[in-house]
Amino acid sequence: MTQIHQINDIDVHRITSGQVITDLTTAVKELVDNSIDANANQIEIIFKDYGLESIECSDNGDGIDPSNYEFLALKHYTSKIAKFQDVAKVQTLGFRGEALSSLCGIAKLSVITTTSPPKADKLEYDMVGHITSKTTTSRNKGTTVLVSQLFHNLPVRQKEFSKTFKRQFTKCLTVIQGYAIINAAIKFSVWNITPKGKKNLILSTMRNSSMRKNISSVFGAGGMRGLEEVDLVLDLNPFKNRMLGKYTDDPDFLDLDYKIRVKGYISQNSFGCGRNSKDRQFIYVNKRPVEYSTLLKCCNEVYKTFNNVQFPAVFLNLELPMSLIDVNVTPDKRVILLHNERAVIDIFKTTLSDYYNRQELALPKRMCSQSEQQAQKRLKTEVFDDRSTTHESDNENYHTARSESNQSNHAHFNSTTGVIDKSNGTELTSVMDGNYTNVTDVIGSECEVSVDSSVVLDEGNSSTPTKKLPSIKTDSQNLSDLNLNNFSNPEFQNITSPDKARSLEKVVEEPVYFDIDGEKFQEKAVLSQADGLVFVDNECHEHTNDCCHQERRGSTDTEQDDEADSIYAEIEPVEINVRTPLKNSRKSISKDNYRSLSDGLTHRKFEDEILEYNLSTKNFKEISKNGKQMSSIISKRKSEAQENIIKNKDELEDFEQGEKYLTLTVSKNDFKKMEVVGQFNLGFIIVTRKVDNKYDLFIVDQHASDEKYNFETLQAVTVFKSQKLIIPQPVELSVIDELVVLDNLPVFEKNGFKLKIDEEEEFGSRVKLLSLPTSKQTLFDLGDFNELIHLIKEDGGLRRDNIRCSKIRSMFAMRACRSSIMIGKPLNKKTMTRVVHNLSELDKPWNCPHGRPTMRHLMELRDWSSFSKDYEI
């Protein structure tokens, strides 16, 4: 047995240091925390080669007393707390005494500090935090900490850092932005020195400003667009009694005013005021930047109920007593625990919803350009010029139909009062006779149409509820009444004709002639697709027809369409199964009640079909005997299947076995192992898969599968053509977005965006657009460029070569759809095998670009209980 022994102090220090400082972001965060705790109002951070060479953090804080030089970089030496109980009352960002000690363990650390300028001391520390050298220098009051050669003694981390230092620098800037926004009294300056020695200003804020000004300084002039100040109070005093025994034993807790104040800025709920991503969501607790995913999720859910296409920009600070939170959770102290979190989230959600309910909805107003207005005027003039020749004759028809409709209480349109009275399905007459798809085709674009009143639709005797329709105002006085049929689909105009509907009914209502024991009989019947052939009494049938005709005359246009569809469905060929008895509305039919027909009677046969029935007793007995035998066989097979099911259940009493049995997993490699059975309905491929003695049956959509393969092929190999601009267009970006562009130039070039990087310009203004992608009539602009930046930031970085903006993705999806195997095409086995095997090469083979699933599981063949139900009588 291996002997237990103690790890030496140096190795322990190296192990624990790697847990505290994990990347560039945590290293910079610890330095900023120390500067803020030192009461500094000016913090300057200088990166050399994006932090790959060194990081320097300078402040004008209190400085370090010479008596503390020896303990400055030792593990767990701090001036913030003296005992564990102090953690619940700590007001500083740091308190554990691990930051500088951990930095010594993974990098080279030097400190320049003074409390009485201009004389200052420069201190250098070794890996365990001991002073190796002390020299005298000069500086203003404050402290400068220099961290160089980060992760120099950790080969794996150093190699990873050298590969991803720009990406880590971008993440680090996001953290610094969070500090700069909430600390309005501190001036932040962030610089980067390139390997060539050029110093670039990346981020800067003003001292003694406000959160509003800091947001504008960090994110530019448009940073405050759509934001609104918020000040909410969450009253949790009703929950104090429940918390007293569950969360704390402090008797003074009952005297505490348990209210949380939420202050800051959040996006308005109007469309266009939010953002397309969650890149600007910051939560603070007592001005401490934290990662509070639960609260942010609540904000996003509430915002989605008002604006379901965007995400809110969130800058919220929670002010509450320190005794109600626990910040000692993770080494970076960015994850906190909140007492009675569920109640806090529920009250916050309700309060935020009430806040948004009080807001007024602000819609962006679209202003038409002068060219659009002129084009609409020309269109409207041409339309009315074309109609002027037939206007007089239409007016005559209009007045005639108007008078007739008024006398018969039919529908008419009153253009002055905006009221439509509609009954009995009479058409409305219009001066325009065209098959227009919508009103704007005639009267112009949305710039000339205002919807400010309602049109009341009175159905008269119809049972359809009253509808309110928007009225339309135009400058033209020629529009009086609108014909509803002008806006209907021409294909359905013939269907709704009453004459044709009645003619179809005559075909359906022809009598049926049949022969029983040599005598011919005639009966009226109705043939429907749902019920088959149904016999009805003469009086009842005539009464029903009268009711149907009356109801048809009073029905609406929609009812006429539905009726016509049902009529067409009724006249479809129906296969009559002689094993199924004909349905009859009468309880019994005696032979004497049938009307005998003479031998010389001439008549038309119903669809040329003759129904022959042999009603002999012998056949009935034979059928009954066969039915009993079949029923016994079916019952026996059912019992055997039930026994197998019970046996399987008994074998799956173990939870793991049961879960494994009920769980079906399919990997991309399984597509290569699937065997093609055949094609179903000229649209689907039936395949089988054998895994662990299980035979699964799958159905594969031939069109969706081939479309997905073609789509991902286009995504991977297509390089978009681009159109050069006459003058290169400068692109104003935030520092983080610019770094994303610089780190992913091949992705933008593949999407057709040709860029030029001017290293002499300041950060945020170095990118210039040389050309835009082009494809026939599709236009691209800076919005697509910004969308591509967002998609790259959201991507995990594994397959960035396939990132495309939404317009290009839609074009690829359409091309892939049109070039794929269509539904209805017969396939041979070789083609079906190729389609199925291609799915194994795709990144995400489970859905086509339009969302259709490529495959579904049908059953496990081993558990198939055959078609026993089909043989039941």
UniProtKB/Swiss-Prot annotation:
<keyword id="KW-0539">Nucleus</keyword>
<protein>
    <recommendedName>
        <fullName>DNA mismatch repair protein PMS1</fullName>
    </recommendedName>
</protein>
<keyword id="KW-0597">Phosphoprotein</keyword>
<dbReference type="Pfam" id="PF13589">
    <property type="entry name" value="HATPase_c_3"/>
</dbReference>
<dbReference type="GO" id="GO:0000710">
    <property type="term" value="P:meiotic mismatch repair"/>
</dbReference>
<comment type="function">
    <text>Required for DNA mismatch repair (MMR), correcting base-base mismatches and insertion-deletion loops (IDLs) resulting from DNA replication, DNA damage or from recombination events between non-identical sequences during meiosis. Component of the MutLalpha heterodimer that forms a ternary complex with the MutS heterodimers, which initially recognize the DNA mismatches. This complex is thought to be responsible for directing the downstream MMR events, including strand discrimination, excision, and resynthesis.</text>
</comment>
<dbReference type="InterPro" id="IPR036890">
    <property type="entry name" value="HATPase_C_sf"/>
</dbReference>
<dbReference type="GO" id="GO:0016887">
    <property type="term" value="F:ATP hydrolysis activity"/>
</dbReference>
<keyword id="KW-0234">DNA repair</keyword>
<dbReference type="InterPro" id="IPR014790">
    <property type="entry name" value="MutL_C"/>
</dbReference>
<dbReference type="InterPro" id="IPR002099">
    <property type="entry name" value="MutL/Mlh/PMS"/>
</dbReference>
<dbReference type="InterPro" id="IPR037198">
    <property type="entry name" value="MutL_C_sf"/>
</dbReference>
<dbReference type="GO" id="GO:0006298">
    <property type="term" value="P:mismatch repair"/>
</dbReference>
<dbReference type="InterPro" id="IPR014721">
    <property type="entry name" value="Ribsml_uS5_D2-typ_fold_subgr"/>
</dbReference>
<feature type="region of interest" description="DNA- and ATP-binding">
    <location>
        <begin position="1"/>
        <end position="357"/>
    </location>
</feature>
<keyword id="KW-0227">DNA damage</keyword>
<feature type="region of interest" description="Interaction with MLH1">
    <location>
        <begin position="661"/>
        <end position="873"/>
    </location>
</feature>
<dbReference type="GO" id="GO:0030983">
    <property type="term" value="F:mismatched DNA binding"/>
</dbReference>
<dbReference type="Pfam" id="PF01119">
    <property type="entry name" value="DNA_mis_repair"/>
</dbReference>
<feature type="modified residue" description="Phosphoserine">
    <location>
        <position position="393"/>
    </location>
</feature>
<dbReference type="InterPro" id="IPR038973">
    <property type="entry name" value="MutL/Mlh/Pms-like"/>
</dbReference>
<dbReference type="GO" id="GO:0140664">
    <property type="term" value="F:ATP-dependent DNA damage sensor activity"/>
</dbReference>
<comment type="subunit">
    <text>Heterodimer of MLH1 and PMS1, called MutLalpha, which is the major MMR MutL activity correcting base-base mismatches as well as IDLs. The heterodimer binds double strand DNA independently of a mismatch with positive cooperativity and has more than one DNA binding site. Forms a ternary complex with either the MSH2-MSH6 (MutSalpha) or the MSH2-MSH3 heterodimer (MutSbeta), which recognize and bind to mismatch DNA. Ternary complex formation is promoted by ATP binding.</text>
</comment>
<feature type="modified residue" description="Phosphoserine">
    <location>
        <position position="566"/>
    </location>
</feature>
<dbReference type="GO" id="GO:0032389">
    <property type="term" value="C:MutLalpha complex"/>
</dbReference>
<dbReference type="Pfam" id="PF08676">
    <property type="entry name" value="MutL_C"/>
</dbReference>
<feature type="compositionally biased region" description="Polar residues">
    <location>
        <begin position="403"/>
        <end position="423"/>
    </location>
</feature>
<dbReference type="GO" id="GO:0005524">
    <property type="term" value="F:ATP binding"/>
</dbReference>
<dbReference type="InterPro" id="IPR020568">
    <property type="entry name" value="Ribosomal_Su5_D2-typ_SF"/>
</dbReference>
<feature type="region of interest" description="Disordered">
    <location>
        <begin position="379"/>
        <end position="423"/>
    </location>
</feature>
<feature type="compositionally biased region" description="Basic and acidic residues">
    <location>
        <begin position="379"/>
        <end position="402"/>
    </location>
</feature>
<dbReference type="InterPro" id="IPR042120">
    <property type="entry name" value="MutL_C_dimsub"/>
</dbReference>
<dbReference type="GO" id="GO:0005737">
    <property type="term" value="C:cytoplasm"/>
</dbReference>
<dbReference type="InterPro" id="IPR042121">
    <property type="entry name" value="MutL_C_regsub"/>
</dbReference>
<dbReference type="GO" id="GO:0005634">
    <property type="term" value="C:nucleus"/>
</dbReference>
<comment type="similarity">
    <text>Belongs to the DNA mismatch repair MutL/HexB family.</text>
</comment>
<dbReference type="InterPro" id="IPR014762">
    <property type="entry name" value="DNA_mismatch_repair_CS"/>
</dbReference>
<dbReference type="InterPro" id="IPR013507">
    <property type="entry name" value="DNA_mismatch_S5_2-like"/>
</dbReference>
